A protein has these predicted regions:
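Residues in the helix-turn-helix
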Residues: 66
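A short alpha-helical element within helix-turn-helix/winged-helix DNA-binding domains
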Residues: 50, 55-58
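Conserved short-loop catalytic and cofactor-binding motifs
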Residues: 27, 55, 120
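A cross-kingdom feature that marks ATP-driven nucleic-acid transaction machinery
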Residues: 69-79, 83-182
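Interdomain motor-coupling "hinge/lid" segment immediately C-terminal to the ATP-binding subdomain
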Residues: 1-45, 49-50
């Protein structure tokens, strides 16, 4: 039988607590589950946005190198994937901060304890962007189509969510839940 909403939430919570907080920590011989949880929450609330590692480090009260180590661990454990900035003109384009996406929106929701239905959520745009980015990644992996992936943003706030560079040929994607433009 189909699990109830409460049953689904319980499954996600168990996944987050067992897979993320036990397996990932054991894998890297890391002791700080509170630190890992805090970093994951910060990333979850910033999906699709550029993330300042200095801000994350200050928020969790650790040094930037430790944050980088945790992020590397989370990427190797297939929890998150990073996206660097694309630039051909460093004076007008932002490249210093990466974006992070979760390979599973359910895990993201479990981390921040957000299980409301779509029409009751204020983060639907972030969920949509995360979903489409990951589906694109899975599709290209399945088809063995490899390219460098970036986002593009100018200091005047113009942005493209995903730029794929394959053999010098660029392809751009913008993910919007609603027709409203930023």
């Amino acid at each position: 039988s189909e699990p109830t909403q409460k049953g689904k939430v319980k499954i996600l919570e168990e996944l987050v607590n067992s897979y993320l907080l036990k397996d990932v920590l054991t894998l890297a011989d890391v002791k700080g589950s509170k630190i890992l949880t805090s970093i994951l929450k910060l990333l979850a609330f910033q999906v699709g946005s550029q993330v300042s590692l200095n801000e994350v480090a200050n928020s969790v009260n650790i040094d930037v190198k430790t944050v980088q180590r945790y992020l590397d661990l989370l990427e190797k454990a297939f929890v998150i994937v990073s996206l660097e900035g694309f630039s051909r003109n460093l004076r007008s384009e932002v490249t210093s901060k990466a974006k992070y996406y979760f390979l599973d929106n359910g895990i993201r929701n479990g981390i921040i304890q957000q299980f409301n239905k779509i029409d009751l959520r204020d983060d639907i745009g972030k969920l949509w962007e995360n979903f489409l980015f990951i589906e694109r990644l899975k599709y290209r992996t399945y088809k063995n189509i490899y390219s460098n992936r970036y986002f593009w943003r100018t200091y005047s706030q113009q942005e493209i969510d995903l730029v794929e560079d394959r053999d010098g040929k660029l392809q751009a994607f913008e993910y919007k839940w609603s027709e409203k433009r930023k």
